[in-house]
Regions:
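Terminal substrate-recognition subdomain of acyl/acetyltransferases
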Residues: 338, 360, 364-426, 529-592
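Basic, amphipathic juxtamembrane/active-site segments
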Residues: 254-279, 364-371
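Acyl-donor binding region in acyl/amide transferases
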Residues: 484, 490-565
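Substrate-recognition element of Asp-dependent hydrolases with the DxDx(T/V) motif
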Residues: 272, 276-307, 455-460, 464-465, ...
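A conserved beta-strand-loop-helix scaffold within acyl/acetyltransferase catalytic domains
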Residues: 431-511
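Extracellular glycan-modifying ectodomains
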Residues: 1-242, 249-250, 255-261, 354, ...
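Conserved Lys-Pro-Asp/Glu-containing loop-to-beta segment of HAD-superfamily phosphomonoesterases
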Residues: 332-353, 359
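Short hydrophobic/aromatic-enriched beta-strand-loop microsegments
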Residues: 61-64, 317-320, 365-373
């Protein structure tokens, strides 16, 4: 639906929201259900409506609790029966500068202003701590937008008596708290208001007439921003950017104009635009976005263009380069298959509207922003919110390297006729560990990012993972895989809750980067042996179907589990007699 893509079609979003909701629910019959509490310092009904729409397009169906008008602090500090019974998965504190109870004046001393700043910050910090203690779920907090007037003009931003200066300093305190607390996230309305236009955003009519924190037409932009954070937390980010070449990464057509005729680099304004876009793409790579090329070109010409002396991107920045005369939708499908990623993990960037339309029609799930003018490419991708970062792991920072290693493995496989011999040639070592503190962040990240090889799709915060690790009733294991081509890092997670002599597997997932390598065999062998050592006689496994995890529907059957129950929605329960388990003995060394 184009109304959700930048630039947002606010008229459709606001006026046809009921129809949009029906259509989105029809498109995704198995959404992820989440409870979101909105604690507002202003009217929040439209915020909830728009946030619900944006989350639905990410496959998340939200149920909302909304505080009464301006009761955000009271609900957080003193609670309500309704909020307590709601048990939110996420709390969004929707406040703005009008919720500050004190602002400096020229009559205040700098000491008084500092004390005022501390008091205003303490008002919020105390609330965040109370929410963490009671609910232990992620909290999203607006920072503060600026008032749409400056009492002292330009001096307002640097003079301690200025409201703009005070709000800027208070925002910095919010950011310091966010940096120190892993489940706390800032929704940057300071940026959103500037991007939208502060005068329009802060139109006082909407505050005094309706008690909206911003103008009505800005609420979809606010909702898109909050939804981007939430979908990132639940693993709904895009993972890959697939790029055309001619008139996308450089100006001109390399096959016609030659490398010397391309517009790229500092010599001409057009070349500067493309160089800046290449720099942006390279920066995306640095935060874990994988890059690929899908271009109608001869491969030699494509590589020559990517080696242009004034270019920023080089061939080894890409995990796949499809430069040929095949249809681009077919190339993209091939890239997805090679990387073991679903099509909905991709963003396709191409200057040609005809190519964009074909890919959008033929490859459901891929995001296809309407690139219009090279000077707008960065803006279109950035405002799309495709790659919102809520956490960065070491694996994210070396994602391209990991995929290059997989390409080397694929080349090695081609030289073997026997798959077992190929696996032996990889010289693999699996290290199976408890949920140790060093791995907590990565484990939590995997639970929220893994969709295909994920039997229960249980999404966990770092605190959830710690709680499992510290509970003696839980048997928790994570697996790391190393071979002669490199270190894949933590790639698989299992967790089971023991009740008597039965172990219930609540969590079982694996990164698709290591499919068909035997890592699941190593984990099952280890898990069963460890369970037996704890006196477990029966292991129960659970499969909950989603739109993406059909590949593991019969996973437990392959290990000798017996299906004992199947629900109408396809959910299944399996049981294993531990004494009868036959170890798989995968083609790898297993270390503990």
């Amino acid at each position: 639906m184009d109304c959700f893509h930048y630039p947002l079609d606010t008229e459709t979003l606001l006026r046809k929201k009921r129809r949009l909701r029906r259509e989105l629910l029809a498109q995704n019959p198995h959404p992820l259900h989440k409870k979101i509490a909105i604690l507002g310092g202003s009217t929040t009904n439209e915020v909830a409506d728009q946030l619900g729409l944006f989350l639905l397009q990410y496959g998340i169906e939200a149920e909302f609790y909304q505080s009464e008008y301006a009761q955000y602090w009271q609900d957080a500090m003193f609670g309500t029966p309704e909020l307590d019974e709601f048990h939110p998965d996420i709390i969004y504190v929707h406040t703005n500068w009008r919720n500050l109870t004190a602002l400096p004046t020229t009559a205040d001393s700098e000491t008084d202003i500092d004390a005022m700043l501390d008091d205003q910050y303490a008002h919020f910090e105390t609330m965040w701590q109370a929410l963490e203690a009671k609910f232990g779920c992620p909290v999203i907090q607006n920072n503060f937008d600026r008032p749409n007037f400056r009492l002292m003009g330009n001096r307002d931003i640097w003079d301690p008596h200025g409201r703009s200066n005070f709000i800027s300093r208070l925002n910095q305190k919010f950011y310091a708290y966010a940096a120190a607390h892993e489940h706390f996230y800032i929704n940057d309305i300071d940026y959103l208001s500037a991007d939208y236009g502060l005068t329009a955003w802060g139109d006082a009519f909407f505050w005094h007439m309706y008690k909206y924190a911003m103008c009505l037409d800005a609420i979809p932009s606010l909702a898109a921003s909050v939804a981007a954070i939430i979908k990132s937390l639940y693993g709904r980010n895009k993972k890959a950017l697939v790029l055309d070449l001619d008139n996308t990464l450089w100006g001109g057509i390399v096959g016609d104009d030659g490398v010397d005729g391309l517009a790229i680099g500092p010599e001409v304004p057009e070349g500067q635009v493309y160089a800046e876009f290449q720099s942006y793409c390279k920066a995306l790579k640095s935060i874990g976005v994988i890059l690929a090329v899908d271009s109608k070109n001869d491969e030699a010409n494509a590589l020559a263009g990517l080696n242009h002396p004034d270019g920023v991107l080089r061939p080894d920045d890409f995990v796949a380069i499809k430069a040929n005369w095949e249809p681009k939708d077919r190339n993209l499908t091939d890239i997805a298959a090679e990387l073991n990623l679903g099509a909905d993990s991709f963003v396709f960037a191409d200057d040609n509207p005809a190519e964009r339309a074909i890919v959008a029609a033929q490859v459901p799930g891929v995001a296809v922003p309407a690139l219009d003018g090279a000077e707008n490419y960065i803006k279109m991708l950035d405002h799309g919110g495709y790659f919102e970062v809520t956490a960065l792991s070491k694996e994210d920072l070396k994602k391209t390297e990991l995929y290059h290693q997989n390409a080397e493995r694929a080349k090695a496989q081609a030289s073997f006729s026997d798959y077992g011999q190929y696996l032996d040639s990889l010289e693999m070592t699996a290290t199976v560990k408890d949920f140790e503190p060093l791995y907590i962040q990565r484990i939590a990240q995997l639970t929220n990012k893994s969709n295909q090889f994920n039997l229960t799709t249980l999404r966990c915060s770092e605190d959830d993972i710690r709680a499992m690790a510290e509970n003696p009733a839980w048997l928790c294991r994570c697996g790391k895989l190393v071979d002669k081509f490199g270190d894949n890092g933590i790639v698989t997670v299992t967790a089971g809750e023991q009740a008597g002599d039965t172990l219930h597997l609540r969590l079982w997932l694996m990164s698709c980067r290591v499919l068909k390598r035997g890592m699941e065999d190593a984990m099952m062998d280890t898990m069963v042996a460890d369970a037996a050592a704890r006196g477990v006689k029966t292991i129960c496994g659970y499969y909950y179907p989603t739109a993406k995890n059909a590949m593991v529907r019969e996973f437990y059957a392959s290990f000798g589990f017996e299906k004992v129950e199947e629900a109408a929605d396809g959910a299944t329960t399996w049981q294993l007699d531990v004494a009868a388990y036959q170890p798989k003995h995968p083609h790898m060394k297993i270390e503990r």
